[in-house]
UniProtKB/Swiss-Prot annotation:
The gene is RPS6. One of its GO terms (biological process) is translation. One of its GO terms (molecular function) is structural constituent of ribosome. This is Small ribosomal subunit protein eS6. Keywords: Phosphoprotein, Ribonucleoprotein, Ribosomal protein.
Length: 217
């Protein structure tokens, strides 16, 4: 079995391969369980890990919520593991693996919650830079001190990073959803305009009805 271990604090990730005698100790554990890494080997002694997922030998992913070692065929929708939704609202019945670890699991995904005293090469002794920045314009402005009168937030931040980073490869990717936010704002304004128009029409109809049958406004 292979272990895909990640350390989110440092942004590192590394693949390990364990022996059969250590692999057996992981059997019957399920997604979300925490354990001492000492059962996997001396290099992980004192490290607290958590199981986050995995794949079997045929590539079917483990899914939490199904307490079984076997495969199941639940009805999946958009956002569920093991199903990529192509059309809006379409649900499919797909095969996925249960959340309990068994001998049929090929790769197991783990994260380090608390490192031990020993340094793990490539995980706890290394730090990877952030690859993406916040997507919200408000957070970007606060992080880099972008003035309110500045309209091109992405360009302003990119100029700051270029002046600070000698190597352009180290500049993190800037994801900005300003266009999407603008479209959402336009959509909300359009909906509000339609509602106000409907309300105005209803008020006029009510007024005409009262004048016609009750002679009062």
């Amino acid at each position: 079995m292979k272990l895909n271990i990640a350390y989110p604090t440092n942004g590192t990730q590394k693949m390990f391969e364990i022996e059969r005698r250590n692999e057996v100790r992981l059997y019957d554990k399920k997604i979300g369980d925490q354990f001492d890494g000492g059962i996997l080997g001396e290099e992980f002694e004192g490290t607290i890990m958590e199981i986050t997922g995995g794949d079997d030998y045929q590539g079917f992913p483990m899914v939490s919520g199904h307490l079984t070692k076997k495969r199941v065929r639940p009805l999946l929708s958009k956002g569920d593991a093991g199903y990529r939704c192509r059309r809006k609202g379409v649900r499919r019945r797909k095969s996925v693996r249960g959340s309990i670890v068994s001998e049929e699991i090929c790769v197991l995904n783990l994260i380090i919650l608390r490192p031990g005293e020993k340094e793990i090469d490539g995980l706890t002794n290394a730090v990877n830079d952030v690859s993406h920045l916040p997507r919200k314009e408000k957070k970007l402005r606060k992080m880099f001190g972008v003035p309110d009168e500045e309209k091109n937030v992405v360009g302003y931040i990119r100029n700051i990073l270029k002046s600070e980073c000698d190597d352009p490869k180290k500049i993190p990717k800037i994801r900005h959803n300003g266009k999407r936010m603008k479209r959402e704002q336009e959509r909300r304004e359009q909906i509000m305009k339609i509602r106000l128009e409907r309300k105005r029409i209803l008020e006029e109809e009510r007024k005409e009805y009262l004048e016609k049958y009750f002679n009062k406004a």
